[in-house]
A protein has these predicted regions:
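Glycine-rich phosphate-binding loops that contact phosphosugars or nucleotide phosphates
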Residues: 66-203, 207-208, 235, 270-271, ...
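Membrane-targeting and insertion segments and their boundary/processing signals
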Residues: 4-18, 64, 104, 156-160, ...
Length: 366
């Protein structure tokens, strides 16, 4: 359905923006929404810990997940990136789970009826592929994680959880972090694990890290200047933030950027590394040593590396270390995204943003 077929504007998240907000540039909106992330996460944690309806829904989905079959987290774009954190955490807890691209799943899967639980993750609730999946659900349990209570998906699905990020007019930032957090919380419920203490610890680190990393953004932009290509590399929960980070850089700035898993980059693309190449490598969690080794090999081939880790390291001409406070697994999927977010802002401030703010939902095409 197009905007012209509606009698009123389809405002993002169903909320009309203020006139002051409508006058802001994309770069200003993007920075504002990046800096709103800590408060949005706090709002989500408070609701998922204290709201009886949300707690009841989490318990309901936990029970439904006990059925035979894998758990599927289904999304597109930034929402797919959020799915990766939840699926990785479930797999680490010995529960079969997969992050699935909705467009691929819609057209090429004949096994969706075998899932114990399929969680549809969507910010808008209006993407054509996700709407179709909600209209024609599999025989297994279907649930929704969505940021728009006025959406088509929200009206079609009975079991649903809110993302609680508020309207988002720039590139996916706070919706990615909130949706990732919600996926992790649901995974913890399914695994029978407490989540609040680890989440609150991460949030404290996230807030201070955001300020520190964003203060370093010009240093990162200067380090990357002239790169023909930027790759973002992660493993486990941080693989989702690697995909999201590359999307953010490329969509907002036009700078060529691509994501890779650590193993995927090691076995092939590393052969292409030279002085025109920059890698942002997340050396975090249980596979941190593999990330450090990969960074050293990239530097040895003449490439430049922004190495994101929980240790202090001396910088060099081709190595820019960025230290993150250690957080409990799998919450590095949230803290690590701050580095590509900050770099994106610096590039946009220097060269301008390639996108315009989006205040209304447009035509949703496959």
């Amino acid at each position: 359905m197009t905007h012209s077929e509606n009698q009123s504007p389809r405002w993002i998240a169903g909320i009309e923006p203020s006139s002051d907000l409508l006058s802001l540039s994309m770069t200003s909106i993007y920075e504002m929404e990046c800096r709103e992330q800590p408060q949005c996460l706090a709002t989500l944690f408070d609701a998922y810990e204290g709201d009886p309806d949300i707690k009841g829904q989490l318990g309901n989905l936990e029970r439904k997940s006990l059925s035979a079959g894998p758990i599927l987290l289904v999304g597109m774009g930034a929402s797919y990136c959020s799915c990766v954190a939840g699926a990785s955490w479930l797999q680490s807890g010995a529960r079969s789970a997969f992050a699935v691209d909705a467009g691929e799943w819609l057209h090429y899967s004949s096994t969706k009826d075998q899932a114990a639980l399929s969680l549809i993750v969507t910010t808008s609730g209006e993407s054509a592929e996700l709407v179709e999946l909600c209209r024609n659900p599999a025989t297994g349990s279907l649930a929704l994680l969505c940021n728009n209570r006025n959406s088509t998906c929200w009206s079609l699905v009975e079991d649903k959880l809110p993302i609680l990020a508020g309207p988002e007019y720039g590139n996916a930032t706070k919706t990615y972090t909130n949706a990732s957090a919600a996926c992790i919380i649901l995974a913890d419920h399914i695994l029978g694990r407490a989540w609040s203490e680890d989440a609150r610890r991460m949030l404290q680190s996230f807030s201070t890290t955001l300020d520190r990393v964003f203060a370093q953004r010009n240093e990162m932009e200067d380090f990357c200047r002239g790169a023909a290509n930027i790759v973002v590399v992660g493993r486990g929960p941080a693989y989702g933030s690697a995909i999201m980070g590359a999307l953010c850089i490329r969509e907002m700035t036009g700078q060529r950027a691509a994501p890779h898993s650590g193993g995927g980059f090691r076995h092939g693309p590393i052969l292409d590394v030279d002085q025109s190449h920059v890698a942002i490598i997340f050396a975090l969690g249980r596979t941190a040593a593999l990330g450090v080794s990969l960074a050293q090999d990239c530097v040895a081939r003449g490439g430049r590396v922004i190495l994101v880790e929980a240790e202090d390291r001396v910088p060099s001409e081709r190595l820019l270390p960025i230290r993150l406070d250690p957080v409990p697994e799998p919450w590095e999927s949230l803290t690590s995204i701050l580095i590509p977010q900050a770099l994106t802002l610096a590039i946009a401030e220097r060269h301008g943003a390639r996108l315009s703010p989006r205040f209304q939902y447009g035509e949703m095409k496959e």
